[in-house]
């Protein structure tokens, strides 16, 4: 749905909606998961609903991402321009996430404190997107 939506209204608004809604929902959703999962009779329905809340920002980011990245760069540099930052981010951000989440949880004595790491990254990405991400919908892919 989000890829289709980005074809209709633009890549930038859908991506920014995903980043901002992700930053706003990560902490409350995990607090809810902690609460509903620790009840004597865990509320499975609420747990599923809360997990689905996180799917919306993810879909808003990944849906248009595959169209946005190629549209940002000319054909002669596209492969390197897309692959290099994508894989560096996957390695550095994705690779460091378990360590950072665990370290923050231990450092502050709260297992949910580690969620400030992905929340902070989403806030940073939102600011960068607001300042620098152009609208690329309908941009020709030829040089």
Q: Model-derived features: where do they sit?
A:
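Intracellular juxtamembrane helix-capping segments at the cytosolic ends
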Residues: 60-73
